[in-house]
Amino acid sequence: MLRLILLSAAALSVTASAASAETIRWARAGDSITLDPHAQNEGPTHALAHQMYDGLLQRDMSGAIIASLATEWAALAENPNVWRFKLREGVTFHDGAAFDSEDVVFSLNRAKQEGSEMQELLASVVDVRAVDAYTVDMETAGANPLMINNLTNMFMMDKGWAEANDVVMPQNVTAGETNYATMNTNGTGAFMLVSRSVDEKTVLKANPNYWGKDLYPTEVS
């Protein structure tokens, strides 16, 4: 829900037309703790991450769960412990890399690692596996109909980008760690990082290749 509220305010004001850019300034009581999408599980950090990263699912303005990077999802009839997700095709990360099932498997496993405060949301997950390039199965220890509620803040990272920048493991904020993802991003979201000064200012720009640009208003006249 936070994502859509912010998109309706921020994205609406980011571009007035193709020839005339507008800027919106968004003041908050507290800054994001980190840009690493799997390090912290708290409101201000998620609110900023939602602008640059997407989850498999999201919430609409009423709070209902709707499609995001996954277009279909259901527990398998033959095994209710397994959730199957059909992924959105044609999505790219901000650097142009294609999004596929390998990124989902990587991201969910990364969020389960020691030091990630997101791991509690995936505590019942015992396996995540790619069925094909755009299908992922997530198996839980028992039938878990509430699991999809935990996926709206579970952001998808580019596996290749993470490996290239040595951020396969999430930042452990409690231990005082920092990593490349602390100050840099590469998501599939509506906005791209331009610059960041912690506790002062974070500057974003519209993602011209955003997969959802035809679903949400991005121009104002």
Indicate residue ranges for each PLM-predicted region.
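Short, solvent-exposed loop/turn elements at domain surfaces
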Residues: I33-H38, A64-I66, H94, L146-N149, ...
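Gly/Pro-rich hinge or "lid" segments in bacterial periplasmic/extracellular proteins
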Residues: F155-L215
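Gram-negative bacterial Sec-dependent N-terminal signal peptides
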Residues: M1-S20
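Aromatic- and charge-enriched surface segment that lines or borders ligand/interaction sites
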Residues: E72-E117, V131, D137
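Short, well-ordered beta-strand elements
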Residues: E22-I33, T71, N81-F85, V104-L108, ...
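Surface-exposed binding/hinge segments that line
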Residues: K86, E120-P170
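Extracytoplasmic/secreted envelope proteins and their assembly/folding machinery
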Residues: A21, S32, A49-Y53, I66, ...
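N-terminal lobe/hinge region of extracytoplasmic solute-binding protein
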Residues: A27-E78, N109, N186-T188
